[in-house]
Amino acid sequence: MQRLAYENEKLARRPQGHNGEYFVVCTLYYTPKESGFTFARGFDATPVTKPGLHGRTYPRDFLRSVKKEGFGRIVTPVNGRQYIRYNGGGSFGFASHPAGGGGVLVDRYSAAAKLGQSGLHRGAVIETESPTVQKVFGSNRWKIMDTGGGLRRWQIDCYFGEDEPLGPGKFQGRPRATTFEYAYANARILN
C-alpha cells in the first residue's frame, strides 16, 4: 500500500493534480458456483442452512465463499432464482442476478471500489493500463458499480464472472480459470 500512496502523491503534486488519473491495484472478485464445492475437491461440503435460506442446505464452504464474494450460483434454482446473495449480519437470500448498488454485474466490465473516494466513485468508467489485467480479464475498461467492505483506497476489485473455485482454503476466493491475485495499473477516468 505504500507504493499506492507514493504514486498517487506524485500525481496529486502535478500542476493539474490527479486530473482523472490514479495509480491503483486491481484485484479480482467473482461469483462462485455451488457445483465446484465438493468433498472430492477438498472442500467442506457439509450441507448447512443459514437465516434467509428457508431450510435449504448448501455446502458449508460455498456459503463461506458467498459471504466473501457477495453472490453465488446455485445448482437448483429457487422460485426461478439462480443465485444466493449475502445480505450481511449472517443472513442470506435468493436473487435473480449478481448485482451491486449500480445494477446487474457484467463479467469483465463491472468493478467495485471503496466508498468515499473522490474520483473512483460509483458510476465512474475507468480505463486501466496493465498488460496483466488485459491478459487475465480480456478487458481494460471498467465501470464502478459496486462497493466492498474490505476494499482499500485506490483498490479496484474487477468482476471476473461465474466460475467454480480454484481450490479449497485460500484458493476458494479465486476462480478456477486463473491464479491472478493482483496487478498495479495506471487508471484514467473516462466520464
What is each of the regions a protein language model found here?
Residues 6-191:
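Solvent-exposed, well-ordered loop and adjacent helix/strand elements within mature globular domains
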